[in-house]
A protein has these predicted regions:
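Short glycine-rich loop/turn motifs
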Residues: 19-21, 58, 144-146, 164-165, ...
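Short, hydrophobic/aliphatic alpha-helical segments
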Residues: 32-46
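Conserved catalytic-core subdomain
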Residues: 1-18, 159, 213-341
Length: 341
């Protein structure tokens, strides 16, 4: 299929309407078969559960053109499983995992003309989401739901290449103990908006959220997990029940152990340790890894020696290996790559 006439090299990270999206409705205790539709609008009641009480969750994933010309997506089964966890926590009906993966493949195949070519630096971003659709005026779960998937071509999340970020230790909390920090609920992201706008006004790229209970342990940012590297090349990632289980982080841990032979620790990371790390990065679907050059803790600057001007050496190896796997340049572990076309 001929590609759309898009300036792939200068594509921003924003929404571009594509031709098809998947829609399935839940009513009377069951999901319908679902359809691909050209209609990009959502029509719901003014009193819909999602509008009144934020009953919604979502996922984020990408499709790529590999070096050998295939269109693939990366570990969609893990997105399906994570969305199931989100639905259960928000009292929403689970969209079956096998149907989730199949619907993702349908949407990507139907929008093949929008999948950026190999080497362009651009990808097709895929957004599955679900919301309560029927009128709800009392505080309770909705009875009817809609599950949708749209796709949009996006350029690199970090425009102009990989530039180390300056982040601050944040006084706001992202998640509460026994709350919803471990799921991909829309409400979590709404709560982070004030803090990120404030950070940008203060001249910072991102927030480093701490645990709400003691405010001594590193959690994550508003949309990415942390990954640290010690001076003796050990990879360390924060462990907490209120952190979203990042698929990128999980994959980087495997890459570190199995491909690079590095020692990995998943454990509590204390703020007082930050000065001792050699490298720091933010990992997630959008950018894979964004290097952090400086962390500011209430006026105290912590400069990462390997990240002030460019990505640190270990972080760079992790990034190059994982993106190599995603793009088909490096052999992937079994089940990681779902070939669509």
């Amino acid at each position: 299929m001929e590609k759309k006439n898009i300036d792939w090299a200068n594509l921003g990270f924003g929404y571009v309407q594509t031709e098809k999206r998947f829609v399935s409705n839940y009513k009377n205790g069951a999901w319908d078969e679902g359809v691909l539709t050209s209609d990009a609008t959502v029509t719901i009641s003014e009193c819909a559960g999602v509008l009144q009480y934020a009953q919604t969750c979502f996922e984020g994933m990408k499709a790529y053109t590999t070096e050998d010309g295939h269109i693939v997506t990366f570990r969609p089964d893990l997105n399906a499983a994570r969305m199931e966890d989100s639905c259960k926590r928000l009292e929403m009906p689970v969209f079956p995992q096998d149907r989730f993966v199949d619907a993702v493949c349908q949407v990507v195949a139907a929008n093949e003309a929008y999948v950026p070519p190999y080497g362009s630096g651009a990808t097709l971003y895929i957004r599955p989401y679900m919301f309560g659709s029927n009128p709800v005026i009392g505080v309770k779960p909705a009875d009817e739901y809609q599950f949708r998937i749209f796709a949009t071509p996006v350029g690199p999340y970090l425009k102009g290449g990989v530039k180390p970020l300056t982040i601050r230790v944040c006084d706001f909390d992202r998640a509460a103990p026994h709350g919803t920090g471990h799921i991909k609920a829309g409400l979590n992201y709404a709560m982070s908006l004030y803090a990120i706008v404030d950070a940008h006004h203060q001249g910072y790229d991102e927030n480093m959220y701490l645990d709400a209970a003691t405010r001594t342990k590193v959690e994550e940012t508003g949309g990415a997990n942390f990954i640290f590297v010690t001076k003796d090349n050990k990879v360390v990632t924060p462990k907490s029940s209120t952190i979203l289980p990042s698929i990128t982080r999980r994959s980087l841990i495997t890459v570190a152990k199995e491909y690079l032979g590095l020692e990995v620790e998943e454990r509590e990371v204390y703020v007082e340790e930050l000065k001792d790390f050699a490298e720091c990065g933010l990992c997630g679907t959008a950018a894979v890894i964004s290097p952090v050059g400086k962390i500011v803790d209430h006026g105290t600057e912590i400069c990462l020696p390997s990240g002030m001007t460019e990505m640190g050496p270990v972080t760079k190896k992790l990034y190059e290996t994982l993106t190599g796997i995603q793009m088909g340049r490096i052999e992937a572990p079994e089940g990681w790559i779902k070939v669509i076309k």
